[in-house]
Amino acid sequence: MKRLVPAMLAMFALVGCTAQGSQDDGDPAGSNRPTTDSEAAKGSYTYRLPIAAYSYTDAEYASIAAAEHMLARTCMARFSLTYQPPPPNPPQPSADRRYGLSDEKSAALFGYRMDPSEAPKQPPQLDADVRAVLYGKREDASVPAEYQGQKVPENGCLGQAQSDLRKDYSDPEGAEAASRISSQSYEQSMQLPEVQAGFRNWSACMQKNGYTYASPRDPFAAQEFREGPVTEREKATAGADVSCKRRTGLLDVWFTEESKLQTAMIAKDRQLLQKLQDVHRQKVAAAKAILAKG
């Protein structure tokens, strides 16, 4: 993708298309995944796109993560170490930025920045022995290979647990297909006449409000909106951005046109994606079985 500021603008296209942690999981979704069938999830754009059907929901990811921690606890017990898995966090809908800003409240509070409350939670403090065996060398290459005469898994008990749960439910080919569709449909959608017209209408609306931008991606490239504290100017710009999207119907037009592209792309890879979906269901079922055993 051609971007002026790749790290920032990647939030648009890569929301919902890159793997969380590892593509070996067979999941094309990113950090902003669908939560459940909640009204919040239904109201988003990313999670209503056709390709979202081939991703885990946040609730499913939470089950998988909880199961991995349960397996890690069993592994830790073999080293006579007590590990208490973190309590599961109820999935919360996160900002949907595939098409840039779309939430008036977030724009008014944080401008073009992410809501600080959506930052990853810090892991609980663990004592040195527990931490060394739980994470192994993936966190600290100097960690000893053994603990009290027993070999520590190279990536620790948690890494081993993740590997054990993942190995039977990996579909990298399907995950690659889903990720490719999500990326390509986004890029191609911006070239469609309907979306281009939407950009022009949005740009004209922004011009009336005193802001000169050709596309909704442009404000994210502004240095002043990426560094330092959020200013009133940034909040005002972000508010106008969202307001103009609503007035011109850009969000719905963009979503509709990209959905058409994805539907056609999915039809060409139907078998691959069906297998990916089956693998997802099997892995979630396995995770829930682990949790049921306690």
Annotate each predicted stretch with a short phrase.
Residues 1-21:
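Secretory targeting and sorting signals
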Residues 17-294:
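Cell-envelope/extracellular polymer assembly enzymes that use nucleotide-activated donors
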